[in-house]
């Protein structure tokens, strides 16, 4: 082979090798791009709506990649699409309640800037629980705290913090309110906020941080709502509101709200005579509330709300061990499941109970005359049998030598069941403790447990002599 032929042969081989390498690089590039976009794909929702995919974590090689086995594929993780809550899981079977949270707000107020509050409650979104309360527009160590025993002033606002975080100066004021309710539908928070003149108040409906709807007083006598969480099922939320006399005939209505917009209003029906400050919980596919009769009964009213057709029915908790304060002695108290018992019906206190088959779990003050102490127990047959009085699983939450106050229920969805929890308002200051001019509270929170538990007492714990006057 002459020199020219050698040169041509070497050149041809080199060109062939270069062409093969070039084609391999194109194949590698095509494979990389294809794999990248396959990693990037999101499964569309059932209704075929377009869902944008936002990058969460992207891992990259910092050098040029030549060989496929050295390539790190960029992977973008698509966020889960929020869904409405339906609360379709069964209720957890429990043996009692275990301690969950305590905020110690009043004790901390002795040396820190903590809001003056009352009417607290707890509610949870799908991932976290929050505590709410109606602030008085002042901290405790502040001359404005003088006279905060009063319920309705234009400076009251709804406060919201993560559960266990006291209401410090950085706390968010969600809305203007001297009566409120809040709940999360799975996508966003709904807040029902009542404020204004006693004879012409306004309820604002705030959804996902925006004012969406409102309604004015319909009886011109202190429009008011639950002071605990509302309940949302499949995107429709329901809240109980009352306008009218606190010790006589009043007009109670059940409102149905979707993404902040009122879609239906149902009047109260059934045998309940007076409804205030309901504690509501999901009972799929419906909602059930246990309330306060401030007029005729120390047995608690029950409202059953049908979400499908907006129908309402009502009666009273059957247990003869009644839940309101003041009340008659347990040996003489009564309830027939249908009517108020006409036993020390006025005034009353916000409370809770929930059904467990034929039984009822309930909480109440230990004192039958005042808001002191707090206990929980289960009454055998207490949901279905008139005047049932067989009590089991009693627990002391706050001993009888310490003040309690309002209490209410909230629900938490677990992996396999829905747990019931409750909070107790621990009121301090006036009217019982006249050394100081203010009225405020802390809270203690318990949740249902299927395990064992011990004993104790969890009062507010502030020494009133250490507190600002």
From Swiss-Prot:
Region listing for Involved in apical transport and lipid raft association, in residue ranges: 11-33
Glycosylation sites: 61, 70, 86, 146, 200, 234, 402
Sequence segments annotated as region (Disordered): 324-349
Annotated region (Head of neuraminidase), positions in chain: 91-469
Sequence positions that bind Ca(2+): 293, 297, 324
Cofactor(s) needed for function: Ca(2+)
Enzyme class of the recorded protein, top EC level: hydrolase
Pfam families listed in its UniProt record: Neur
Regions of this protein lying in the Intravirion compartment: 1-6
Enzyme Commission (EC) number: 3.2.1.18
Region feature (Hypervariable stalk region): 36-88
GO molecular-function term, one example from the UniProt record: metal ion binding
Cellular localization per UniProt: Virion membrane; Host apical cell membrane
GO biological process, one term: carbohydrate metabolic process
Post-translational modification: N-glycosylated.
Virion surface face residues: 30-469
This protein's record includes keyword Secreted: no
Topology versus the membrane: Single-pass type II membrane protein
UniProt keyword Oxidoreductase present: no
UniProt catalytic activity: Hydrolysis of alpha-(2->3)-, alpha-(2->6)-, alpha-(2->8)- glycosidic linkages of terminal sialic acid residues in oligosaccharides, glycoproteins, glycolipids, colominic acid and synthetic substrates
InterPro entries: Glyco_hydro_34, Sialidase_Influenza_A/B, Sialidase_sf
HAMAP family in the cross-refs: INFV_NRAM
Name recorded for this polypeptide: Neuraminidase
Gene that produces this protein: NA
